[in-house]
């Protein structure tokens, strides 16, 4: 119990003075106690290293460790486990979503390649049809041109033949007239037209 100096002084002053014998005995006891206390203070060790305190220290250590274990197992570890489990589920969901997106991308690429192949095939078909159509149109135009040219050549040949026939007819007439005039100049008489015509035709043959 802690006692202040003033309280101890007041208590001492209020007590009656001891007798001479009692005073001597008290001094002797005080002297022996002081010596014993001095001896005890001089030979004392640090309390944590005092073997007499080991049992209590081990007890408190066990209690502290038990409380720490309970705190870790009931509070900290479940929270950490919950966080890890949540994180694992989130990672699994992310991986699943990534796989789904990859599958969608693969499907889109396959569809694009299929559409591209179909477009190329259709373009080739259209080009081939246009080429065939152009070839057919060219053949038709060439045939039309050849027919027109042949018709014009035939017309030209007919015209030339007509001109030639007319020219030959004119030449025959001129020859007959010339022959008749020559005969008339030579013989002094007019020649027979039928005879002159027969003679000119015979000479042309």
Swiss-Prot record:
Q: Which gene encodes it?
A: atpF1
Task: Identify its membrane topology class.
Answer: Single-pass membrane protein
Q: What is this protein called?
A: ATP synthase subunit b 1
Any one GO cellular component localisation term in the record: proton-transporting ATP synthase complex
According to the UniProt record, which cysteines are disulfide-bonded? Answer: none
> How does the record describe its quaternary structure?
F-type ATPases have 2 components, F(1) - the catalytic core - and F(0) - the membrane proton channel. F(1) has five subunits: alpha(3), beta(3), gamma(1), delta(1), epsilon(1). F(0) has three main subunits: a(1), b(2) and c(10-14). The alpha and beta chains form an alternating ring which encloses part of the gamma chain. F(1) is attached to F(0) by a central stalk formed by the gamma and epsilon chains, while a peripheral stalk is formed by the delta and b chains.
Q: Where is the composition biased (Polar residues)?
A: 1-15
Keyword field contains Transport: yes
What is one Pfam family matched by this protein? ATP-synt_B
The record's listing under PANTHER family reads: ATP SYNTHASE SUBUNIT B, ATP SYNTHASE SUBUNIT B', CHLOROPLASTIC
Q: Which InterPro entries match?
A: ATP_synth_b/b'su_bac/chlpt, ATP_synthase_B_chain
Q: Does the keyword Transmembrane helix apply?
A: yes
Instruction: State which residue ranges cross the membrane.
Output: 56-78
Q: Which organism is it from?
A: Brucella anthropi (strain ATCC 49188 / DSM 6882 / CCUG 24695 / JCM 21032 / LMG 3331 / NBRC 15819 / NCTC 12168 / Alc 37) (Ochrobactrum anthropi)
What is known about what this protein does?
A: F(1)F(0) ATP synthase produces ATP from ADP in the presence of a proton or sodium gradient. F-type ATPases consist of two structural domains, F(1) containing the extramembraneous catalytic core and F(0) containing the membrane proton channel, linked together by a central stalk and a peripheral stalk. During catalysis, ATP synthesis in the catalytic domain of F(1) is coupled via a rotary mechanism of the central stalk subunits to proton translocation. Component of the F(0) channel, it forms part of the peripheral stalk, linking F(1) to F(0).
Family according to the record: Belongs to the ATPase B chain family.
Q: Where in the cell is it found?
A: Cell inner membrane
Alphabetized, the UniProt keywords read:
ATP synthesis, Cell inner membrane, Cell membrane, CF(0), Hydrogen ion transport, Ion transport, Membrane, Transmembrane, Transmembrane helix, Transport
Give the span(s) annotated as Disordered: 1-26
Lineage, top-rank taxon, reads Bacteria
MF terms from GO for this chain are: proton-transporting ATP synthase activity, rotational mechanism; proton-transporting ATPase activity, rotational mechanism
Compositional bias per record (Low complexity), positions renumbered to this chain? 16-26
């Amino acid at each position: 119990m802690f006692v202040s100096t003033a309280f101890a002084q007041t208590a001492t002053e209020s007590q009656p003075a001891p007798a001479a014998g009692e005073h001597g005995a008290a001094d002797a006891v005080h002297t022996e106690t002081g010596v014993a206390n001095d001896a005890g203070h001089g030979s004392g060790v640090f309390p944590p290293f005092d073997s007499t305190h080991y049992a209590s220290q081990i007890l408190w250590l066990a209690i502290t460790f038990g409380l720490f274990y309970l705190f870790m197992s009931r509070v900290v570890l479940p929270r950490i486990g919950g966080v890890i489990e949540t994180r694992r589920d989130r990672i699994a969901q992310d991986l699943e979503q990534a796989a789904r997106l990859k599958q969608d991308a693969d499907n889109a690429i396959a569809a694009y390649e299929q559409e591209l192949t179909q477009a190329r095939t259709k373009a080739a078909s259209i080009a081939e049809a246009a080429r065939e159509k152009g070839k057919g149109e060219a053949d038709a135009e060439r045939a039309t041109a050849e027919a027109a040219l042949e018709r014009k050549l035939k017309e030209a040949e007919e015209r030339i033949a007509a001109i030639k026939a007319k020219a030959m007819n004119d030449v025959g007439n001129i020859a007959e007239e010339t022959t008749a005039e020559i005969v008339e100049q030579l013989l002094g008489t007019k020649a027979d037209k039928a005879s002159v015509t027969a003679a000119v035709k015979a000479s042309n043959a």
